[in-house]
Amino acid sequence: MQPSYNVERFKETFESEYTYLNGFMRNVFRRGNEPALICPLTNRTWTYRTLNEEANRLASSLMARGVTSDDVVMHALLNSAEFVFTYIATHKIGCVNAPLNYRLSGGEIALLIDQSKPKALIYDAEFEKIISEALRSVHHRPEIIIMADLNNEMDAPEGVVTYRDFVKDGSPENPVRKDKPSIYDETTRFFTSGTTNLPKAVPVNDINEVLSAHDVIMHFPLSPKDVTMNLTPWFHRGGLHSGGPCPTLYIGGTMVILRDFTPRLALQYVSLYHITFLIGAPTVIDMLCRIQETNPRDISSLHGIVLMGSPLDKEPCKRYMKVLTPNIFNGYGTTETFWNVFLRPYDLPDKAGYAGGACTDDDVRVVRVDTTKHVSPDELVPMDKETVGEVVIFAPNKSTFAYYDNPKTTEEKFHNGWLYTGDLATWDEHAYITIIGRKDDMIVSAGENIYPVQVESILNEHPKVAESLVFGIPDPKRGSVIAALIRPSDPSLTEKEMKQFCMNHPMLAPYKRPRIFRFVKELPHNATGKLLHKLPPDFKF
């Protein structure tokens, strides 16, 4: 059919104007005097107008030093005002915002610097030692190195400029970008959590950021009246895009900065700033719940708590609904595709333990596992909540289907727009998915496949268990025996109790029962709160 309008004119306008920055600037115009960002530690509030001016100062200062749309600005920043200034400033320049996981080693950071070759590097003073270590071993040294500190009082080391000095002559006026913006411009480069090897660089373009913001706005839902606080580091996608700077500043809401998480401080901020949405991993929300049970505060402003990073079990879910808010959400996704599966308050607590159902614009399926090739997305496993398959995701609105500078892994993980996640799952007749584990976490014992997450969810049902970690130990007879690390919520818990519990549980087959238990104070998690199924090399059973 012949279009009745000028398609080329529509494309040209849409592709250059439907950008994240234009969304933010609409709020500067409409809500200029409304609060955009609050930093409790410095007792400062930025309105949309003053936040825009601060971002302009950084953008114009970077441009004066030669940063263009061809460049990368990398940063190792805590949740902070400078993080937000950098995020907006890079959109204004048209360059790539590349937030680093500041918990990596100096050697790992050096490799990521050499891969992305940033023109500028911004870091918090807390990371001076690790950044200095990284810079000593890089082949590519950024031309501009900036150190931020919370109170703008510290002096920078040689070869580094303080943030306050770098931006002091920057113009508060909106800078003029030298080239035409496009929704296809890479705007942010995330790095995967690196649970299997060195983090992979994931490019996200402008339209991905806009539609990721829309996804959050639609699913929470989020409005300009909301006040959000993301309890996780903003350097990962769930931090930046789930109730973090990306959607909150796009819709015109207010963000409260939590620089370093403590449960008491988080609850204090909820009460003081009338926060409506919290975002965090189940382990973090569990800490909030325990404090609120013993020392309750007024947290009646909460409209919802969004969990991500690991499965949400039924008993904890019921506690959170009773103690914190009845509106609990749980999201599952990847760095590559943002979140793609969601549990909403009307699903809970009945469907706790599930990852959820697919998000509105996404297609998520469980397909036959084949280690030799990509199976067709149509080769589905039965929807019987028993047959295990691999989760595949089609989310063209939130993905570029690629890794930066890594064609081999791109070919391995993406096929015809589908991401092959490596996550194993079952699903039911309503297409609700339950994550069982990862392909590379699967334990084979006496010829049987055992999925750690499945066993952990059962162990976590014990009233004295706060959290568990299940893995295999090499065994000459069985290949592997099942072992469990337990973080108890009650110090009186014994190995005998756990073995009896496993023996009596109707959903734990004998071959899946842990043979060895050890009790620990902490379990290993990555920066996003996800449980790591890799023990330290010096750990002995």
Feature-to-residue mapping (PLM):
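Conserved ATP/PPi-binding loop(s) of AMP-dependent carboxylate-activating enzymes
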Residues: T372-E412, I450
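Structural core segment of the AMP-binding/adenylate-forming
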Residues: A64-R65, K92-K168, P488-P491
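Conserved AMP-binding A3 loop
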Residues: T45-R49, T187-L211
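Conserved AMP-binding/adenylate-forming core of the ANL superfamily
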Residues: N33-S80, V84-I88, S105-A110, R164-D165
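Gly/Ser/Thr-rich phosphate-binding loop
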Residues: R164, I275-G280, C289-A352, C359, ...
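Conserved pre-ATP/AMP-binding loop-to-beta segment of ANL
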Residues: N33, I146, V161, K168-F191, ...
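Conserved AMP-binding/adenylation subdomain of ANL enzymes
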Residues: V210-V227, F235-F277, R290-Q292
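AMP-binding/adenylate-forming catalytic core of the ANL superfamily
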Residues: L104, L111, L121-Y123, L278, ...
